[in-house]
A protein has these predicted regions:
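Signature of lipid phosphatidyltransferase scaffolds
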Residues: 4-23, 137-200
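Acidic/glycine-enriched edge-of-secondary-structure segments
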Residues: 24-42, 63-67
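A conditional alpha-helix N-cap/helix-loop micro-motif detector
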Residues: 38-42, 72-73, 118
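Short beta->alpha connector loops
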Residues: 42-45, 122-124, 140
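Primarily the HKD phosphodiesterase
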Residues: 48-112
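Short solvent-exposed loop/turn micro-motifs enriched in small/polar/acidic residues
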Residues: 119-123, 129, 155
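Short beta-strand scaffold segments in enzyme catalytic cores
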Residues: 127-130, 160-162
Length: 200
């Protein structure tokens, strides 16, 4: 749950109107509005993945598919390992076991084995990232190089999503993630035969 959510705004200069900063001027009054960005194609790498290393408290990731990808020259798994070493709570829900290259890369970071929290659910098809309970990405991009990573613009997938700190959207995303994480749907699930470790 996102009970720790705190509305964050970027104090812009007087007279600057921007939904992206969460601050604008109307009739002499400062009005705070949520940030809402449309994210497409390579924006996923610039606007979403770039935020991962900057979280302070928690990072929740939901994805159907997961493969090895890079953030600049560093493996994404290395970035997650760095977060865990800083004490950040990292949770990952994915739908299927990743391939051998990912598993080999995963094993290079002992902290991932000991501290990364993971849930495998074959019904998960949502793609989301929740940053510090304050900002959320919701969209089509899986956690792969072609989806959200840095694959070239001529080879990557066409993806779309939103990045927002609007409270109701962040809270709804947290609640959906939390329900899957806690196994709320496990008991009556019609696909238990495909699940290696039901939570309930």
């Amino acid at each position: 749950m996102c009970n720790d959510y705190k509305f964050k705004t970027n104090m812009a200069s007087h007279g600057q109107n921007s939904l992206q900063t969460g601050h604008y001027l109307s009739e002499g009054k400062h009005i705070f509005a949520p940030m809402l960005k449309y994210i497409q194609n390579e924006d996923h790498y610039r606007e979403v993945i770039s935020r991962v290393s900057k979280v302070n408290e928690s990072l929740w990731i939901g994805t159907a598919d997961i493969k090895d990808l890079y953030v600049g020259k560093e493996p994404f798994l290395g970035v997650l390992a760095g977060l865990l070493e800083r004490g950040v709570d990292v949770r990952l829900i994915h739908a299927k076991e990743p391939g051998p290259v990912f598993r080999e890369e995963f094993d290079r970071y002992p902290v991932l084995i000991s501290r990364l929290e993971r849930v495998l659910c074959p019904r998960v098809h949502f793609k989301m990232m929740v940053f510090d309970y304050r900002t959320v990405y919701l969209g089509s991009a899986n956690l792969t190089g072609a989806g959200i990573g840095m694959k070239s613009s001529t080879r990557r997938n066409f993806e779309a999503g939103i990045l927002t700190d609007e409270f109701e959207l962040v809270d709804a995303a947290c609640n959906q993630f939390d329900a899957v994480w806690n196994g709320s749907h496990c008991k009556g699930c019609g696909r238990r035969e495909f699940c290696g470790a039901p939570l309930r």
